[in-house]
């Protein structure tokens, strides 16, 4: 065990025994850790340890079991994520993806910062689907997946249009479409936007407008990539998918 200070982003909590809780926090300095909080309801830090909060932790870090919180300060609460069910669903999904992408205790300040910035953009009102798509695509390499959407897999031509081939795990230009008769037959704009999303920095992201039908095409393509190459099935993703028809009902 060692005492330390670190920034931490609360991923989730769950009940443990009668009055205690386990709180999973993605720390900047020590990766994802499970913290034991005794008598959670009476803890002075209870409000600071809700999901979608970020703060400075003073803690005892234990590599072989539960860690323990000594103090929480400089707390940031993502209020819009907490209050809007649609934003909340997207945030819950990307948090689940981050949790699945690396092992517990694995030091990864890059992913911590990427997740934090993604949540900030969601909370600020940036397009939920766009932020989520960017996160999904850029976290793929944490699962060991590296896909190139910027050039043809055969001739390396960098000017589209392109289609995607699961057979070759890459793009095809029109001159090489015949190499895979079962290619995806995508709208060329899907590959263009997916390549943009894979390369863009969140700090450079501006307000952009994408039509609903194009968002659906991108969604279906990314789902296909995850089914083919990653193979995880998250409850938060299933819930998010089930919300597709809610918007009109709740108007």
Curated annotation (Swiss-Prot):
Protein's GO biological process: DNA recombination; double-strand break repair
This protein's UniProt keywords: DNA damage, DNA recombination, DNA repair
Assigned GO CC terms: bacterial nucleoid
Domain of life: Bacteria
DNA repair listed as a keyword: yes
Entry keyword Protein biosynthesis: no
Family, similarity comment: Belongs to the RecO family.
HAMAP family registered for this protein in UniProt: RecO
Primary role: Involved in DNA repair and RecF pathway recombination.
Full protein name: DNA repair protein RecO
Organism: Lactococcus lactis subsp. lactis (strain IL1403)
Gene (UniProt): recO
